[in-house]
Amino acid sequence: KKIVCLEGDSAFGFSLAEVETMARYGMDVLIFVINNGGVYHGDSKDSDEWLKLRQNSLEGVKDGLRSTSLGWEVGYEKIAEMCGGKGYLVRTPDELSQATEEGFKATVPVVINVIIEAGQAKKVVSSFGSRPFLVPQHRLMTPH
């Protein structure tokens, strides 16, 4: 039986070493990593902006990466490849469809790294436990 997992990039950071265990025991697992470059949302709209924020952090300058930032488009799919599984990096619906089809055919651990918008232009407006949701800035209601 195939096991299908859906995790954010932050959650996958805590469990990525288990891909080696899955490969070692021949587990048939398909993992989708929803990658926005941050715990709630990323900090940057592109790699140049992220590198500038990172440099500010390294130099101790104001306006660096937030503590909830993650690396820019980290290649999580490579974890599966390094352990004997398969990995796919996807950015488009067509790539996602193709990788999903291949992932369901495979009998080794598969990681599909789904790059989505970082969401830096959004803000967390509510949180239920650890489940915040994001709303685009133009849709936020302001009190009158």
Question: Whereabouts are the PLM-identified features?
Answer:
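Thiamine diphosphate
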Residues: 1-144
